[in-house]
Structures are given as structure tokens and as C-alpha cells.
Amino acid sequence: IVQYDGGVYWGTIHNQNSMALTMEQKCTKPYCFGVPANPREQRALNDGVYRSTSFWRGRNLEDPRTREIQLLYGESQLPVCCAAPKTFGMQATGWTPLYGPSGFGNRGNEYTWTMAVYDGHLFIGTYDASILQGPSTEAEYGADLWRIDSSDSPAVNEDYSGLGDIRNYGIRALRPLEDGSGIVAGMANPANLAPGGGWELRLLKEGSP
């Protein structure tokens, strides 16, 4: 949660192996999915409960008369179970995203992991689970870094690929330097045995690649 340009910003976490998946598999009630009988049903269940991170902003939170909550990145509809056995149908969420879909348009972004204000901008680091989700294109791998320039502007992508290392699946921390010369990113990287793998710190400066 970060305060920026007159608003409070926050994001959500939705890990792929979530409690929702476990509950839908084990529940025997008619409104639950139940145990998948085949790979097709397992895929339907996995897709039905999967969620990417949503991103929100609140204003005037202390005054219920003027309080404003905005969904910046999210969905106006999401799958719900189970109007018919082993099926998901779409249901309205009651929200309309101001700027775009969940995950900042990247389905693998499951978690808005960190944020920091630097040089008048709001920087946002994600946890991108794409590399753990099976075969995909390498272009989708690696944590995202996003930037918001003002309360009137959408997020702009700074990097899609783990700040140069696709095995960096998360930007775990962002910390501006006290002298204002840059911002330090602490990465999450599970590939500690890979050449060049493991935990990293990245120094980000204006104009640097």
C-alpha cells in the first residue's frame, strides 16, 4: 500500500495453487466443481479459479460521504462455478476497470509485490508466475516493472522480463536511494543453481537499460 498523488494504491495476490483450487476439488456440494475426472476437467478447473493481480486506488478514505474506490486494472466479469456440473460461467464483478485488465495485461502477474515513489513517479513491481506455468514464450517470463506518472495517467511499462533476467520472477522490493540518484530493486529468483542465477540487487537509474 502506497500513498501517491492524492490517492492510496494497492494490489491483490492470487497464487495459482490457491485455496480456491483446493476447495473446489475437495468439495462435494452441488455448487462446487468436485474432483476432476480427466485432464480436460482439470484444465477447466485450473482456468476457472485462476486470477491475475488487480490494482486499485482509493481517495478520501476517511470520509464516507466522499470516499472513492477505483479499480484501475481488473475485470468486469470473472468465472464462477457451477451453474452446470463441471463448468464455469461468467459473472459480473460490479466493477469496471479504468485502464485495463488484471495483471496489467499480463496473465502471469499474480501479485502486486512492491511499490515505491521515486522522482515524482509511482513504480510497481510484480510477481510473474509465467515461468512456472508450463511451456510459453520467453517474452512472457520475468517480473514486470510499471510506472505511473500521475493520478491522471495509466501505468507505463518499464520492463517485462525480470529487469534483464527472465528467471527473476519477482521484484520483491523497491527502495529509492537517499541521494535521489536512482532506485534499488531487490529481486526474487528461484534458480540459484543456474549460471548467473539466484538473488539479485539491481540499481535503476534514468536512461539506463
Language model: regions and residue ranges:
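Signature of short aromatic-glycine-proline-rich micro-motifs recurring in repeat-based ectodomains
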Residues: 1-3, 15, 42-53, 85-119, ...
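Extended non-catalytic domains of envelope/secretory-pathway proteins
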Residues: 7, 11-12, 24, 69-72, ...
